[in-house]
Amino acid sequence: MHTPVNYITTWFYKESKEEASFYPQLGQKGSSSLVHSIYMQIQVPFFVTFKHYNPDAQFIFFTNLNQKELPDYLIRLFHKLNVEVVTLPYTCKPPKDWYPAWQNQFYLYDILKYMDDRMQENDTLLISDADCLCRTPLNTLFDAVRKDGSALYEFITDRVYSINGITLPQMEEVYQSCYGKEAASSITYYGGEFVALRKDIISKINIAYPQLWAFNLEYVKQHPFKLNEEAHILSLLAEHLNIRNKTANRYVKRMWTTPHFNNVQPGDENYPVWHSPYEKKRGLYYLYRLIGEKSEITNEADFWEKAGKYTGIPHISLKKKVKDRLTTLWMKFK
């Protein structure tokens, strides 16, 4: 009898100069050496924290790079933590100049195609962005996915806000045009940074995705808006396949810690998973340096005290503000 497997995965797609899109949080295009080095470094705190609290899960790192192209410290880490590296081509790539930013994001659907062939009944898959830290075991998350089929992160419900070039009412127009019916309830935006799915739901997504994507390519020829990124697609597929929920909201929060916008509140430090997009070249870099060659958490209380100070969760200290500024300047001239 097959014992169900919980897969925890993240990914990095290295863009070429010809296809490079803009990464707003890093202020660089995806082909830059800075972007590459930062994304390699943040794999360390990601895998160390997720593995520490979920030792029985199977871990995979997806990339278009060959393993020999990874930095030595990452190869050593993956060997120690038993992280599998899967080199996967990008076949779901959008057309050139599709949207100015984040054109690597449709790699998610290549991962789903790969995992569909690999997973068995009742296996579950978590695809997480690498700028996340795990604080607790995720057994209850996987149990919920095994029961309900999915755990999605509902991030935006504002019907006026333009979400990377499209509003929720406009997404509903695309949905109605594609499927010939209105959504059963108002469309909401599900973030692509934390998506957990059961094997059979992955199969359904892989069947439904080509139709929606082909429709999207034709739709933009006659309309001023389109589904620009992977989460737009996911949000419509969730409605179409009746897998909508906000289960993942109990586990993760996208925590903005910029000088201009901060949505972190006291108590947010208790989330099982911290998503810290602004901290890629700041707090997560400091954690990469802290972990070093140890590749493990030896003192949980000490580690999370430092992690909170480094990432500004739940409070940003004056010391962090100064250190962040100096680190940013140093990286500019690195």
Describe each region flagged by the PLM:
Residues 130-132:
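Short acidic donor-binding/metal-coordinating loop in glycosyltransferase active sites
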Residues 20, 70-74, 136-139, 235-236, ...:
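A short acidic (Asp/Glu
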Residues 37-46, 93-126, 136, 140:
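A conserved donor-nucleotide-binding helix/loop in the catalytic core
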Residues 134-171:
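Conserved donor-nucleotide/metal-binding helix-loop-beta segment in metal-dependent transferases, i.e.
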Residues 259-334:
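Long, low-complexity C-terminal extensions of enzymes
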